[in-house]
């Protein structure tokens, strides 16, 4: 039985037989022209979409906040340098990733902490934040076993009322409710569907989920947030938080749907977009 020749091999044989210098030059020009045309179309479309967002009237929620993502202001994530930079730049909300060491010391870390020397102790950050009365803290909970120890620290530094939790998945809700953090505000980390948000059944499912969990709203990647979801949540008294918005185009896309919070590694960029809106 003759071996089957793949389409790719057939194409290479065709090129070998027919690729004269003149033909190759003409073919290369066509490919270049095609790619250039595609790039121009994408660029024009991107400009048009961005401009259309900027032409809309901008209204923000009364309690709208910008959270400085850990590592913002050109610092290392979950470090004292980040906390100091956030204070210096007058961030209203800062995000800290929370875990604990094997000895149960609460630390700031995105990744798993395996020794008692890893990561920076959260208490070092709280000592600085407690003296900045208008700063709130977004604690991104990476493991729920840390909740009781975290709560104890917040009580010690009188920061309960200035703190809220994110990173809480549906499977983590039971642990939150059974912890000392049960009465703290928290957003439910969830991946909503922008398309199903038009369905009454799906909309009812979202609201029931929030009612059952006790969350104050949904925290999601900005790619999954849309106007339908935002309107639904606000109509029912819930909030919408989006992450991580780091470009002007995405900032404009998100601002028009009126989230309650935007988490970003570039807070100044978000402020500039708001200040220059419509100009």
Model region roles, listed by residue range:
Residues 2-279:
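Phosphate-group recognition and catalysis centered on beta-loop-alpha active-site segments
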